[in-house]
């Protein structure tokens, strides 16, 4: 067996134990993990400092360095996230439906774990803990394969988590890390059908497309966010300016950040200078259509066709003036990724049409796309934002990491 197959078998065996562990046992393991992360914070930060130094030396973009970085505040947030997951209701064993048939059979559906989950993700060490916590609470074993840029941080976190599991009486192998960060190991994980029940990629478009194209393990597609904010002619322009500023600049590297601003022609001459005044405080680069450049000037870079389909993950915003509602919705249908879309308007009927006609996991009226997040939706930490329609859509919390099985009670019925 290969190293990865050995890990897969160990995870499968550990998962059988975890699947029938009670809520109290799982919560005790999560609390042990939270305390262990706090106690071994210096060890984790030292590992992260090595990752950060290597990333900067390699010329990693600042927005990506921000994703990689850990500090005491971020670790405190990670620990709080683990405790929030522990406090959430346990979905395992919940009876979704129960009916009595005419022949006396009592047939119900009960939530059960998916089994063993593989997660492939980029240089975001917080994902290591968020994913492990969610998988543990939902009764799933997990095999983690993070980006090489965060390898030392991920290894430190997983060592802490495995020790915490053991101290709480659960198998260490409920959480495993693929230590080989080569492309070959990623390909092997994508095809580990004997041991993995589902594969979840978290990262940019390139990573997700590679997994979808090459995996034989079933995939839940997450992440790519070409998100739009559409300023309707009926918008409160001050509100709209605040929303696009937040949606673009509060954390541009994440998948729920806005990448494209659409503005009705009727309000563009008034709105675009207001928006630009706010956006320039964060040195946002605008890439605009000809009408945008006619209003704001030549310092706006001409938008190329590819810009309308790009998740920039940086302080870059594509801007297009549209003739009205229909063009805006058609544009989103052509260029959006089904993640998060927002309209700013005081027009009730326009808002309702937008909610009805825009096909995305999260559709907003008068709010920033940045709220598409497990914590903000009351789910606790999320494993990712699913942009597909099968199995799960939107922030994937505990329930989205379960399946169901039918349970049937009889009194001797035969057919």
Predicted regions and their residues:
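N-terminal Rossmann-like NAD(P)+-binding subdomain of aldehyde/semialdehyde dehydrogenases
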Residues: 1-107
């Amino acid at each position: 067996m290969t190293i990865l197959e050995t890990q897969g078998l160990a995870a499968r065996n550990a998962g059988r134990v975890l699947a029938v562990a009670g809520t109290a046992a799982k919560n005790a393991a999560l609390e042990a993990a939270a305390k262990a992360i706090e106690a071994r914070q210096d060890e984790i930060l030292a590992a992260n400092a090595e990752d950060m130094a290597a990333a900067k030396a390699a010329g990693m973009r600042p927005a990506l360095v921000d994703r990689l970085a850990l500090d005491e505040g971020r670790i405190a947030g990670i620990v709080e996230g683990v405790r929030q997951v522990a406090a959430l209701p346990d979905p395992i064993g919940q009876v979704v439906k129960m009916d009595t048939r005419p022949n006396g059979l009592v047939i119900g559906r009960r939530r059960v774990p998916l089994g063993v989950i593989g997660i492939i993700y980029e240089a975001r060490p917080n994902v290591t803990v968020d994913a492990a916590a969610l998988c543990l609470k939902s009764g799933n074993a997990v095999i983690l394969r993070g980006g090489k840029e965060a390898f030392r941080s991920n290894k430190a976190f997983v060592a802490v988590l495995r020790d915490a599991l053991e101290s709480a009486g659960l198998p260490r192998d409920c959480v495993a890390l693929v230590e080989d960060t080569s492309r070959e190991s990623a390909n092997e994980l994508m095809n580990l059908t004997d041991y993995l029940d589902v594969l979840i990629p978290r990262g940019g478009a390139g990573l997700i497309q590679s997994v979808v194209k090459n995996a034989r393990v079933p995939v839940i597609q997450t992440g790519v966010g070409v998100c739009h904010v559409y300023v309707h002619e009926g918008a409160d322009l001050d509100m709209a300016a605040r929303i696009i500023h937040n949606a673009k600049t509060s954390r541009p590297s994440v998948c729920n950040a806005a990448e494209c601003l659409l503005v009705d022609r009727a309000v563009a001459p008034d709105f675009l200078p207001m928006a630009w005044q706010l956006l320039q405080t964060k040195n946002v680069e605008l890439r605009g259509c000809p009408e945008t450049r006619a209003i704001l000037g030549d310092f706006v870079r001409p938008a190329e066709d590819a810009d309308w389909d790009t998740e920039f993950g940086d302080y870059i915003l594509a801007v297009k003036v549209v003739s009205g509602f229909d063009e805006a919705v058609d544009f989103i249908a052509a260029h959006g990724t089904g993640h998060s879309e927002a309209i700013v308007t005081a027009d009730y009927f326009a808002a309702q049409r937008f909610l009805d006609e825009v096909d995305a996991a999260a559709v907003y009226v008068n709010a920033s796309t940045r709220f598409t997040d497990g914590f903000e939706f009351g789910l606790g930490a999320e494993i990712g934002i699913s942009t597909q329609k099968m199995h799960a859509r939107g922030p994937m919390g505990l329930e989205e990491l379960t399946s169901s099985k039918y349970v049937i009670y009889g009194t001797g019925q035969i057919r």
